[in-house]
Structures are given as C-alpha cells and as structure tokens.
Amino acid sequence: MDVNKLLKALDDESNELLLNFTTKKIKEMNLNILKELHLSKKETLELLNKLQEYKYIDEMNELKYGSYIRWIPIEDPNDIQLTKGALFCEMKITDNGVFCICKNYGFPIRHFQISMDKNLIFQKLTEQEMVLLSALDHLSK
C-alpha cells in the first residue's frame, strides 16, 4: 500500500463519511438495496458485479461534486436497468423533490437532471477512497 496516497486520503475531509465503512459493508449495502428490487438472483448478482467500485447513495450530502454516478430508475418495476452514468454537477432542491444535475461524459456538454426519489444512485469510488477502504479493510481484520 502506498503510504503517501493513504496520508493524502486521510487529509481529505470529503472522505470523512467513508471512515465508517469497509469494502464488505459497502458491498452488503449495495446488495441489500438491490434485493429490494425483487429481481432474480442472477440479475441481482449481475448488477452487483457492475457496481463493484460504487457505493449506494442514500442521502444528498454523500454525493461529491464531479464524481461519476450511475443510477437505476425505479418508477417502472418491469424495466429495471442500470444506466451508463454521468458526472454529478450540482444538487437542485425544488418543491417537486431533490434532483441531481448531471453532465454526460464524453458527449457534447449536455446537462440533465435525475430525481433522487425516483432513482437508486450509486457513486463511483475515487482512487483515494479505494486506498482508504483498503486500509480500513486491513484494520477491521
């Protein structure tokens, strides 16, 4: 493990929320939320595999600006699919709910919004977060 990367990750205050987790806890949290979709075991495991380096976002303060997110629209229980994702730009709170303003990655700049109430949102873990989780995994043994 690179000690300098670990020290940098520990100094970054935005990683503070991650200190209560391990890789195992994140995987369990992702699995539990996916189980609520009542998909087949195969479909659930496929989604879990695609979300290996992602953390389920339950509250808006957990989202980091500039992070890559993927989501599963849950309005239609017969059409459950994981999106390709986008970059999270900002949070918008309206009378209609809380929305994530996102930007397509690799396309001409196009902003759009997704509702936190109508989607399960997963945020990609950064390299710093992965280093920190690796250390937390080691400490939990």
Residue ranges and their predicted role:
Residues 1-37:
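Terminal domain-start segments
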Residues 60-78:
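Short coil-to-beta transition motif at edge beta-strands of beta-rich domains
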Residues 65-68, 85, 97-98:
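Short, surface-exposed beta-edge/turn micro-motifs
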Residues 29-65:
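Mixed-charge, Lys/Arg-rich low-complexity intrinsically disordered regions
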Residues 89-109:
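Basic/aromatic-rich interaction segments and small domains that mediate binding to polyanionic partners
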Residues 76-96:
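Short beta-strand-centered aromatic/proline hotspots
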Residues 1-16, 105-141:
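Intrinsically disordered, low-complexity, charged/polar segments
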